[in-house]
């Protein structure tokens, strides 16, 4: 355990007594150091260990939570309107040189909070990226899409218009929502509650997946919870009750594709003839 982690863990146990005026310089320096490293991509709330397995660094989430106890709300002015919050925008002090060095594109009305990371060649349409989130290289966050606190978005992902990727700060032991590399998330879909969508998946428009959502594989009859397997093409559907008197919403895996097929075949073509 690093010295930084030790300071954060100890402070979190005493978080109820911590305020901007009572917190020690050591605690403030540790928390703000973590936020700076999240902002630069040096630290991530969750990291891939191997294959489709991830490890969550809960102490980093604790640092994010502690940051809310260390700062008072202040007046924020973007030149158009004013806000009153504890977390400043990521780009508040960016220069043209900073944006060029970052290598990403930010369209007007995109909002990104400090403590989140945007990788090179990412494109942010008018969207919202919350504190602790990670947006991977070459990813498109489309109009009105939301990337929640600590959510992890992989490389070459397309989050379509109005998509919601849920944030998970509390409970602390919960893992963040994760979207793997090369995924397409269709318009107005929601992936929340720490669900993991593995690499090369296609989620159709209007699919809602939380930890309690049944993810039904129609080829095998298997039901998954909390994780969409690699290469799944998923649409919304229903499963009947045992007595057939009603049905309940589920997500249905209608087919599987590999990365090569995904790269060659258009998304609409994959979703036709299902």
From Swiss-Prot:
Matching Gene3D superfamilies: Hexapeptide repeat proteins (2.160.10.10), Tetrahydrodipicolinate-N-succinyltransferase, N-terminal domain (1.10.166.10)
Gene Ontology annotations of biological process type: diaminopimelate biosynthetic process; lysine biosynthetic process via diaminopimelate
Family of the protein in this entry: Belongs to the transferase hexapeptide repeat family.
Uppermost EC category: transferase
Chief localisation class: cytoplasm
Annotated pathway: Amino-acid biosynthesis; L-lysine biosynthesis via DAP pathway; LL-2,6-diaminopimelate from (S)-tetrahydrodipicolinate (succinylase route): step 1/3
Name of the protein in its database record: 2,3,4,5-tetrahydropyridine-2,6-dicarboxylate N-succinyltransferase
A molecular function GO annotation: nucleotidyltransferase activity
Its EC number(s): 2.3.1.117
Record carries keyword Transferase: yes
Source taxon at top rank: Bacteria
Catalytic activity annotation: (S)-2,3,4,5-tetrahydrodipicolinate + succinyl-CoA + H2O = (S)-2-succinylamino-6-oxoheptanedioate + CoA
Protein keywords: Acyltransferase, Amino-acid biosynthesis, Cytoplasm, Diaminopimelate biosynthesis, Lysine biosynthesis, Repeat, Transferase
Ranges in coiled-coil conformation: none
UniProt: substrate binding residues: 105, 142
One Gene Ontology CC term in the entry: cytoplasm
Lineage, highest ranks first: Bacteria, Pseudomonadati, Pseudomonadota, Betaproteobacteria, Nitrosomonadales
């Amino acid at each position: 355990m690093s010295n930084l982690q030790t300071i954060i863990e100890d402070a979190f146990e005493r978080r109820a007594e911590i305020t901007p005026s009572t917190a020690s310089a050591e605690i403030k320096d540790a928390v703000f150091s973590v936020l700076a490293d999240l902002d630069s991509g040096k630290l991530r709330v969750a990291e891939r260990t191997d294959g489709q397995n991830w490890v969550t660094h809960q102490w980093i989430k604790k640092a994010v939570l502690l940051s809310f106890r260390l700062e008072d709300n202040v007046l924020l002015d973007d030149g158009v309107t004013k806000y009153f919050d504890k977390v400043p925008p990521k780009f508040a002090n960016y220069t043209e040189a900073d944006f060029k060095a970052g290598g990403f594109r930010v369209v007007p009305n995109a909002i990104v909070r400090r403590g989140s990371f945007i990788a090179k060649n990412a494109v942010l349409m008018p969207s919202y990226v919350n504190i602790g989130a990670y947006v991977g290289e070459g990813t498109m966050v489309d109009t009105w899409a939301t990337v929640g606190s600590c959510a992890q978005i992989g490389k070459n992902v397309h989050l379509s218009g109005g998509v919601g990727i849920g944030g998970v700060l509390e409970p602390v032991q919960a893992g963040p929502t994760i979207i793997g590399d090369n995924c397409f998330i269709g318009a107005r879909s929601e992936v929340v509650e720490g669900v993991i969508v593995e690499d090369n998946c296609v989620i159709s428009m209007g699919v809602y997946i939380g930890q309690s959502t049944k993810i039904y594989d129609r080829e095998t009859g298997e039901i998954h919870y909390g994780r969409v397997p690699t290469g799944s093409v998923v649409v919304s559907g229903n499963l009947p009750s045992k007595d057939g008197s009603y049905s309940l919403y589920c997500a249905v895996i209608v087919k599987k594709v590999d990365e090569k097929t995904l790269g060659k075949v258009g998304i609409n073509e994959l979703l036709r003839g299902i």
